[in-house]
Amino acid sequence: MELLKKIFSPLAKTLNYIQNHFKAMLFLLLLFLLFAPTPKDELNTPNLQEIKLTGAIMDATDLVKQINQVTQDNTIKGVLFSVDSPGGAVAPSVEIAYAIKRLSKIKPVIAYASGTMASGSYYASIWADKIIANPGSMIGSIGVIMQGSDFSGIMQKLGIKTQVVKAGKYKQIGTPDRPWKNYEVKELNKVIQATYDMFSRDVANARKLDYKKRDTFANAHIFTALQAKKVGLIDNLGVKYTAKEILVQLSGVKEARWNQEDTFDKIMKKISASTAIVFQTYFPPLTLR
């Protein structure tokens, strides 16, 4: 037994030290990542940048901030807007679209569909100088949807009743405790149709398509990349390398130097994502998907 203790004693001490000083070691690791020497080739000023839109669009604050920063950065000569998103909420999608529109007036922007560029994420991309899509990607779904649930049957079985005091005929619109009334559906449809008109008109203007023929490219059609090109929703098929090469040509840079995301920022984003909590209301969201 004493022999085993002597053999494993150094290992036990090491593990005990790591356990007692984990936070300090993590802090030192973060300091090293922040101040570690930069390779010589990274000391050159970046002249191109990739901005990514991935996942459902629920909030555009960080992405729009990133786009605005690049817009004002004179050292960045062109932007690759990489998209893989099924769409999302209307207002954030519009915010991103108009941020890209402002950016494209100052420097070339290539939007690249790596997997899905549909609904709100397609809206976000329409003002890019060119849209390149992976041959296996899905494009389109230009439409608007609002949906909710009717829990009245379950509530009745559980003996739950809703009590409401309201001012305004439409104030209870979208409630989940009873079927929606015809006048409520009509009111919601008014909003949906107006939003769809805005969406399809912006697409027509940005892509130079005939708005009167919007049923051919909108109407929530889902297209392959090749089909999307035929109806005018994208410019070319290609992989990410293709999109980057086109951006290099449009930006006029002699040597492409891509701006890499800071290592510390990557770590903090992962930590934030793992601890994020999402709150939702019962009111049915208006989404582009």
For the regions a language model picked out, list residue spans one by one.
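Short acidic active-site motifs
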Residues: 120
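Hydrophobic/aromatic ligand-binding patch that stacks against planar heteroaromatic rings
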Residues: 123-124, 154
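Hydrophobic/aromatic residues within transmembrane alpha-helices
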Residues: 124-125, 228
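N-terminal organellar transit peptides
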Residues: 1-111, 115-117, 130-133, 147-289
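Zinc-dependent metallopeptidase catalytic helix centered on the HExxH motif
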Residues: 128-144
